[in-house]
Amino acid sequence: STPIKSSAASDVYKRQGYVDTKNYSYADFANEVNIHTGGISSTIGVYPSVKDKDDYQVKFEVRTKALYDKLPEAATLMKEMLFTSNIDDEKRLYEIIAELKSRLQVSISSAGHSVASTRAMTYFSKAAAYKDTITFYETLCDLEAHFDERKEALTAKLKEMVSSIFTKEHLLVSVTCEKDGLSIVETELEKFIPMLYETSGEEKQAEIVPVRKNEGFMDASQVLYVARAGNFRAHGFDYHGALRILKVIMEYDYLWINIRVKGGAYGCMNGYMKNGDTYFVSYRDPNLEKTNEIYDGIPAYIEQFTADERDMTKYIIGTISDMDVPMNPSTKGDRSMACLLYTSPSPRDTR
């Protein structure tokens, strides 16, 4: 898990398992992964600080799952993917961009609530701006339409990222296993670390400046995803665990009754993050103006809210049930890594 610069190239590079490597075609590589592991994947994780609303960390993450006796094969395949992927294959690179664009187009239509809420938060949140699906989609459209003009610059950027991401200084390893597996992991890490690059010179963190906009996006659909967002820390309020209960109250009372039952939307959501980012969003909603009026009524609803002990107990139980869920080893590892990165300062604060 390593820091990266802000670039659409990083999202394209997540598909590195989809290109030929030194020893395998991308189809053969996929077969080897399936034979020896439970999968190898890469993603970009964005971790807002719980202490500073303007601070965040971005990590390029490579993950795998494997049985103990298959850990050497898993490590070998990860090294094959990270250090020998052929990113000079322009034909394959174009195919990946076109595939990404097509899949993202479907995702935008099917998960409009997530797209809308994130986009609304980009107006004030740097972390949300990193995750903005619409900007990435627009970039992919541009890359596909002007691939011949951009391919050399894109390939150069991908190569630059390989040497700046996979460095010894940036390496952070999270392992979830029993003690028997830890010694095997340590042995494989001793082979892996010498292959990493040395950090060269002073690194520059890409600066994101949120811009407040007034916009809407049209889709080939008869329904809407209506979002409102803001940051309560920017207005002098701190995060409190009671906000988790408020989320349940809103979704099962005020928003549910007004947007789902009376308004006819398929769903409604809200969220309160520890960095202060907050959103309200409707799902497959036939209304725009009415839903916005309902959002306007939220402060008055909270000010006048009353509930007896029985109802509050139900809300609290509902809150805990969302938090206290069984976790498999993979989920436990994700949780522990997130807890570390959400609370630790970003690299630019430690330099």
Region spans (language model):
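A glycine-rich, aromatic-flanked flexible loop/lid motif
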Residues: 46-53, 214-228, 260-277, 284-295, ...
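M16/MPP (pitrilysin/insulinase) zinc-metallopeptidase core fold and M16-derived inactive scaffolds
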Residues: 14-74, 249-255, 262, 271-272
